[in-house]
Amino acid sequence: MEVKEKNPNRIIKLCVIIGLLLITLVMGVYMINVAYHKIDNPNSVDAYFILHCIAYGLLFVLLAFVSIQAMFGTKCKTSFEKLFLPMIIVLGFLYLLIIPIMVVPDEYVHIYTAYDMSDVMMGTHDAETVMMRQADNEHMYNARGITKEDYNSQYEGLFQRPEKTNLIKTAHVSTQSPRYLYILSGLGITIGRLLGTSTTMLYLLGRLMNLLAFIAATYYAIKRIPFGKGIVMVWALLPITLQQVCSFSYDSQLFALCILVIATTMSAVYGKETNRRSRIVNNIVMVASCVLL
């Protein structure tokens, strides 16, 4: 009687699935337990606690998604770009919220340049200094030694309109270049100013525009690159990458342009694309990315 040999890959996959399910279960139980004890004491429910719940909720959803893919991925094969999209959206939104404003290295310098670009868009540009709403100029953020109180201070009045919306000349100067790398973050600030949002919401919108541009560029790159899709996906999901693309840093736009140049060039040389329109679009994106980079 022949004895069938056990497939080691199947055993490894089973262990990974069980591990993911256990982590997901523990995280879900922990999140419910924390929420239950906090609800009993309404005075302890603050911005930090809400942010805490959002973070664990997003991680729970992400782990559940990865677990489902691990269990049924072989039967229903999902392309890399479709697998990447929900992961980058969840992790990107998470990093956007949990990394305090001004904490990313030199972010304050990038914020002032983006704000200056917003002034150009709104016709309030000053050649000498950055014109800002008085509320935005006076709002203080702690960039070092972040504590629970700093999170509460940052998100206090997130959805409230500021009182001091008059424009004033500040001591800040726009020094970063090339300036076109700040168009999207400046657009986010402009949207916030037009909507009359709070200072924190204003800056979060600027960050969000950088993140969305990176997501779109990386999604297109993974779709177009003929091989190495997994490497691009892992690079895009690295903590240091997410930190930069979820901030005002021009690294976000540089990362997007770099990966577009690599992917479109490799697609033009090694790709087996038969659709003429797709090839034309790929070549246009390649040339535009090279020029901007």
Task: Walk through the language-model features, giving the residues of each.
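Transmembrane-helix signature of polytopic, membrane-embedded enzymes
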Residues: 19, 197-200, 219-240
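Interfacial juxtamembrane loops and adjacent helix segments
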Residues: 120-205
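Selective detector of the "anchor" transmembrane alpha-helix that sits immediately C-terminal
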Residues: 52-68, 202-227
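Transmembrane signal-anchor helices characteristic of membrane glycosylation enzymes that use polyprenol
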Residues: 21-30, 67, 71-108, 115-156
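Start-transfer (signal-anchor) and selected internal transmembrane alpha helices
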Residues: 1-23, 28, 35, 45-93
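Membrane-interface alpha helices of multi-pass inner-membrane proteins
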Residues: 280-293
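Hydrophobic transmembrane alpha-helices
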Residues: 185, 189, 218-222, 259-271, ...
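Short acidic/glycine- and proline-prone juxtamembrane loop motifs at membrane-interface regions
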Residues: 247-254
